[in-house]
């Protein structure tokens, strides 16, 4: 049981942080979705993100993260305050955008056919890939070590529940002509899956490359050399009816991405 204690502690920290956040109250619009004018009138922008070393985190009693800093830069430019809620469940983050609990889904969101009908996506913010996470071989003929994606046949890969990587794994299964078993994990985020691989709790996981690269410094037993996807554009998401907010975000992003401040943030929080 002790080996699972660390994951429970991670979950409790995230839960405690979420509980002390003020609960967003839906207002004004009959469908619960605040348009940009309502956001401006309220003076508060509500965002949801994943708690991890890239998006949003606490270090030495200080809040930080790429999306944390981007959100504050946007809010400052628009004269708004920002409320950020950490939520480990991708499903709950997405549902919160759809029902108006949050205005912006501010983490690395991949635009795909399943999501394009449920939300709108900003212009791309950064590039990344999905990486197979496994342990480095402990001996010459380590049977669990994957040298080629073909060797994933009949293996079980753990992913965050509703992760876009599920579609890629399914396509990969078709490409190699054999079954790849997918185990969706609702309770933990990507960094927790990395720790579980490192501690022999599971053998394989899929993770965003930037998160994997950041975590690999603390988990030297991990192998993160095998990509399962091409490089993809990552964006933010907003409700499909919130076109004015989308336009405001896109206009600001296109200007901000040309600044030295943006380049410094990318260097600070990604290792690509």
In which residue ranges do the predicted regions lie?
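Solvent-exposed, polar/charged alpha-helical surfaces in well-ordered, non-transmembrane soluble domains
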Residues: 68-76, 91, 95, 99, ...
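A ligand-binding cleft/hinge motif common to bilobed small-molecule-binding domains
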Residues: 91, 95, 108-118, 168-175, ...
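Bilobed "Venus flytrap"/periplasmic-binding protein-like clamshell domains
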Residues: 46-54, 62-76, 132-178, 183-189, ...
């Amino acid at each position: 049981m002790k080996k699972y204690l660390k994951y429970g502690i991670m979950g409790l920290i995230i839960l405690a942080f979420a509980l002390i956040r003020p609960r967003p109250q839906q207002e004004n619009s009959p469908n619960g979705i605040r348009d940009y004018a309502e956001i401006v009138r309220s003076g508060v922008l509500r965002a949801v993100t994943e708690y991890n070393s890239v998006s949003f985190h606490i270090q030495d009693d200080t809040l930080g993260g790429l999306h944390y800093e981007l959100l504050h830069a946007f809010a400052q430019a628009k004269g708004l305050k920002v409320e950020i809620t950490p939520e480990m469940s991708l499903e709950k983050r997405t549902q919160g955008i759809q029902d108006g609990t949050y205005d912006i889904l501010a983490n690395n969101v991949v635009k795909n056919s399943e999501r394009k009908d449920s939300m709108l996506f900003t212009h791309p913010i950064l590039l990344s890939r999905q990486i197979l996470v496994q342990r480095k071989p402990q001996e010459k003929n380590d049977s669990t070590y994957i040298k080629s994606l073909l060797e994933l046949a009949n293996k079980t890969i753990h992913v965050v529940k509703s992760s876009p990587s599920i579609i890629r794994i399914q396509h990969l299964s078709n490409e190699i002509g054999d079954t790849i078993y997918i185990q969706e994990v609702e309770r933990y985020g990507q960094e927790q899956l990395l720790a579980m691989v490192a501690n022999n709790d599971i053998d394989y996981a899929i993770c965003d490359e930037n998160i994997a690269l950041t975590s690999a410094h603390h988990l030297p037993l991990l192998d993160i050399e095998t990509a399962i996807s091409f490089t993809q554009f990552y964006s933010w998401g907003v409700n499909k009816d919130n076109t004015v907010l989308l336009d405001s975000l896109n206009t600001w992003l296109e200007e901000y991405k040309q600044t030295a401040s943006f380049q410094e943030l990318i260097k600070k929080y990604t290792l690509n």
